[in-house]
Amino acid sequence: MKTSDYLKKYGVKLKKHLGQVFLSDDRIAKRIVKEVGLTPEDVVVEIGAGAGTLTEELAKTGARVIAYEIDESLAPVLRERLSKYPNVELRFEDFLKAKDIPEGAICVSNIPYSITGPIMEKIIEWKFKRAIVMVQKEVGERILAKPGKKTYGYLSVVVQTFYEVKKLFDVSRSCFVPNPEVDSTVVDLRRKSVDLDFEKFRKFVSMIFAKKRKTLKNNLRPFLSVFEGVDLSRRAEQLTVEEIVEFYEKWRRALECSKE
């Protein structure tokens, strides 16, 4: 049965405030799962199971699948579609409030468009060893952007600091129901060995990109004494991820010293 048929069978009405668009092309789901290369020993977390197109393909690998879906009206669809897969655990709750993600899990998701930013932050926070995510094409460009590009900013830096990023392929809007106004991109994220306090780092990056066209001297004005002798004439968008981490470490150490 097709995804659209499941939705019709159970009279599912899309919720605009959730920005719901469901992957309906199982060829795309198969391609994503093939890229991941799952084994029955793996634990996979899916954020936004929707109508279960991707969930079903993940389940076929034999891996343990934990699928989050905030919209309980989709429960009948998911339960019927996944009834023959005992390796799937459906959690009808908000992933952003999740409290028990298994260590070493892999995230494979068609991320809900309306909350991409917060979800990407949670992926970093939960330290997924790998994440294969499908996002709006524009968001994918921001995740992958390099210094000096218009799309380079907060999201680029926080993701690339903690993950090696790679574009896999684009997905046409025609592969979803209803058809969104934009195409999507599938991105592969592999965790780096980085020992940073994500919450503090996130705040620092947010601060230096607060006024994107301003120089570091302007955005770091309350902390100029920390960066004495450092060139602050550039803008944050001109700095590499590595340079931003160096600036962050100076700022962090200065804050810690001031509390002693």
UniProtKB/Swiss-Prot annotation:
Its EC number is 2.1.1.182. Pfam families: RrnaAD (PF00398). It is an enzyme of class 2 (transferase). It is found in: Cytoplasm. The keyword Transferase applies. It catalyses: adenosine(1518)/adenosine(1519) in 16S rRNA + 4 S-adenosyl-L-methionine = N(6)-dimethyladenosine(1518)/N(6)-dimethyladenosine(1519) in 16S rRNA + 4 S-adenosyl-L-homocysteine + 4 H(+). Coiled coil: none annotated. Keywords: Cytoplasm, Methyltransferase, RNA-binding, rRNA processing, S-adenosyl-L-methionine, Transferase. S-adenosyl-L-methionine binds at residues 23, 48, 69, 94, 110. The keyword Transferase applies. CDD domains: AdoMet_MTases. GO terms for cellular component: cytosol. InterPro entries: KsgA/Erm (IPR001737), rRNA_Ade_diMease-like_C (IPR023165), rRNA_Ade_Mease_Trfase_CS (IPR020596), rRNA_Ade_methylase_Trfase_N (IPR020598), rRNA_adenine_dimethylase (IPR011530), SAM-dependent_MTases_sf (IPR029063). GO terms for molecular function: 16S rRNA (adenine(1518)-N(6)/adenine(1519)-N(6))-dimethyltransferase activity; RNA binding. Gene3D superfamilies: Ribosomal RNA adenine dimethylase-like, domain 2, Vaccinia Virus protein VP39. Specifically dimethylates two adjacent adenosines (A1518 and A1519) in the loop of a conserved hairpin near the 3'-end of 16S rRNA in the 30S particle. May play a critical role in biogenesis of 30S subunits. Belongs to the class I-like SAM-binding methyltransferase superfamily. rRNA adenine N(6)-methyltransferase family. RsmA subfamily. This is Ribosomal RNA small subunit methyltransferase A. It comes from Thermotoga petrophila (strain ATCC BAA-488 / DSM 13995 / JCM 10881 / RKU-1).
